[in-house]
Amino acid sequence: MSRPLLQLALDHTNLQAAQHDVALLQESVDIVEAGTILCLTEGLAAVKALRTQCPNKIIVADWKVADAGETLAQQAFGAGANWMTIICAAPLATVEKGHGVAQSCGGEIQMELFGNWTLDDARDWYRVGVRQAIYHRGRDAQASGQQWGEADLARMKALSDIGLELSITGGITPADLPLFRDINVKAFIAGRALAGAQNPTQVASEFHAQINAIWGAQYA
């Protein structure tokens, strides 16, 4: 396992506000995500603007692609994304097409685990070359009071055992990180916990301190 990264999720409804938060936090995070809401509002301009603003960061196009994997991957990676998300309900052919473009561009596909999916699905994604997935506690689940539980951790461990690296998101705070010490974590994704904090850079420092305390220098 490698040391987990810290990802800033930008689910703003306008690009100017997103770029304001990036200006505050880009030196404190490893990955900058053009979130689904931002991309639906601003289109490809969101990915292009973030690439220009953050030339040395990993940029994620969180598009949750369900079809047209090849065409949309060409758009995402052509705009400057390093990673693009595909929704878990997408046909395997869509995953394969998107992954093929990602490989040709030096990028990666992340499978977005919303709704219904199985470990057999995960094995299929791994078989066609995908190595990343995103494990969610969605906005609506958080609002209803759903917490991280043993069932979540067991599913994450099973995905890790298949060989997938997981980005974990859903109201994550630094205090939550010890729950995931046995998981193959690629990144912790925080949006409002970072951008909405009174002192965003301090919260980012707390994330990094907790990551270092749990995973340590041996994973650096």
Short names for language-model regions:
Residues 1-70, 109, 195-197, 201-206, ...:
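Conserved N-terminal beta1-alpha1 strand-loop-helix module at the mouth
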Residues 26, 47-54, 96-106, 126, ...:
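Surface-exposed amphipathic alpha-helices with a cationic face
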Residues 27, 79, 128, 182-183:
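Structural motif
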Residues 36, 88, 113, 137-138, ...:
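Short secondary-structure boundary segments
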Residues 2-6, 68-163:
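Conserved anion-binding
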Residues 98, 149, 181-183, 193-220:
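C-terminal helical cap(s) of enzyme catalytic domains, especially alpha/beta-barrels
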Residues 150-183, 187-189, 193-194:
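A C-terminal functional module that forms or caps the active site or interfaces directly
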Residues 11-12, 61-70, 112-118, 165-175:
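Glycine-rich beta-to-alpha transition loops that act as phosphate-gripper elements at the mouths
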